[in-house]
């Protein structure tokens, strides 16, 4: 009885050792598939290269994929992109097997400041560029299971969109319209004048008496007229007045002007009767043409003066700006150099303290 028990125990132990050894051997070698199985029966089929799939489970074939594009954690759009096999250097730097084929035009559409990197201009606008090698700390990650491409660029390499900005593509010139703004006032008055009384006899012997009272009437009218015409981007304006007094009428044309917005310059072009701005010196009436900046085209954060803050983040970081102990600005930046140029102008005095809080919890402070 004792022998059987010992024998069973020994047998079970032997099987376990063999099973572990087999499992260890299986996991230590990469799986291979004989491509001969994919050829036809007569052996004349094309040779199939499966070495791509022997590099790991994350390996995917290069090709064209429709993906959702995220730039610095912000979803941009869904588009069809070509993906190429990553080079050995790209595999080591980003751990990616596929990298997107992005042209200079596509990078510009995503907000990258391509003009700041001369190497990007050495190739044609539609050719693939190794942006991760040209732009420091730029990277890409392709999530194949979710068909999502995540691109990361240093904040300083991106065009900054100031807070409150409305894209110019959404600006509207308005509808054609005829405008009329008027103000009218008038008065009627009557009064009696008293003179000396008199009497006289006419040829018929009738006696007439004059009590010396006369009734006087006075009418006065005034019209202030501001009219205009909107047609496309053009604005026609006229300012005129009309007055009537003492039986006489007078029409005065004070001024007529034609203006339109010049969007690339964020300015207004005015021709005709106009006046200079009176912000610093007295306003001067003039007749001619004037091109002047229009702050209404700028977001609130771009009106007035505010300093530009520059720094370098070591990781995905939170950047806060304090003044007199109060946080007046906070944003999040990618690794690399960053630039903050959309601070709201403030009338308060005091130094600005910049606090960079890294992903590991460490902080940098500078004034």
UniProtKB/Swiss-Prot annotation:
Its main location: membrane. Induction: Induced during the exponential growth phase. It is found in: Cell outer membrane. One of its GO terms (biological process) is pilus assembly. One of its GO terms (molecular function) is fimbrial usher porin activity. Part of the lpfABCC'DE fimbrial operon. LP fimbriae may participate in the interaction with eukaryotic cells by assisting in microcolony formation. Could be involved in the export and assembly of the fimbrial subunits across the outer membrane. This is Probable outer membrane usher protein LpfC. It comes from Escherichia coli O157:H7. The gene is lpfC.
């Amino acid at each position: 009885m004792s022998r059987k028990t010992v024998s069973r125990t020994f047998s079970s132990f032997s099987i376990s050792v063999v099973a572990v050894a087999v499992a260890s051997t299986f996991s230590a070698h990469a799986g291979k598939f004989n491509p001969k199985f994919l050829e036809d029966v007569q052996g004349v089929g094309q040779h199939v290269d499966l070495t791509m799939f022997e590099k790991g489970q994350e390996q995917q074939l290069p090709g064209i994929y429709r993906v959702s594009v995220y730039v610095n954690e912000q979803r941009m759009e869904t588009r069809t992109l070509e993906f190429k096999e990553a080079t050995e250097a790209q595999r080591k730097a980003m751990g990616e097997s596929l990298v997107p084929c992005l042209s200079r035009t596509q990078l510009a559409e995503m907000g990258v400041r391509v003009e700041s990197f001369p190497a990007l201009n050495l190739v044609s606008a539609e050719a693939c560029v190794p942006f991760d090698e040209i732009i420091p700390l730029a990277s890409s990650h392709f999530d194949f299971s979710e068909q999502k491409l995540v691109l990361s660029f240093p904040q300083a390499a991106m065009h900054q969109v100031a807070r409150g900005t409305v894209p110019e593509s959404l600006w509207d010139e308005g509808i054609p319209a005829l405008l009329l703004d008027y103000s009218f006032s008038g008065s009627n008055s009557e009064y009696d004048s008293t003179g000396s009384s008199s009497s006289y006899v006419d040829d018929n012997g009738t006696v007439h008496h004059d009590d010396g009272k006369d009734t006087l009437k006075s009418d006065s009218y005034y019209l202030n007229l501001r009219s205009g015409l909107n047609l496309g981007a053009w604005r026609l304006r006229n300012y005129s007045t009309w007055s009537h007094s003492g039986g006489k009428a007078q029409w005065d044309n004070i001024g007529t002007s034609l203006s339109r917005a010049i969007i690339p310059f964020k300015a207004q072009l005015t021709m005709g009767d106009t006046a200079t701005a009176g912000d610093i010196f007295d306003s001067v009436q003039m007749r001619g043409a004037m091109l002047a900046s229009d702050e209404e085209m700028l977001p609130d954060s771009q009106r007035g003066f505010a300093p530009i803050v520059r720094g370098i983040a070591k990781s995905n970081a939170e950047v806060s700006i304090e003044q007199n102990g109060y946080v007046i600005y906070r944003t999040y930046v990618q690794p690399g150099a960053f630039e903050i140029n959309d601070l709201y102008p403030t009338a308060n005095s005091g130094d600005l303290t910049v606090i960079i809080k890294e992903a590991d919890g460490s902080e940098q402070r500078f004034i």
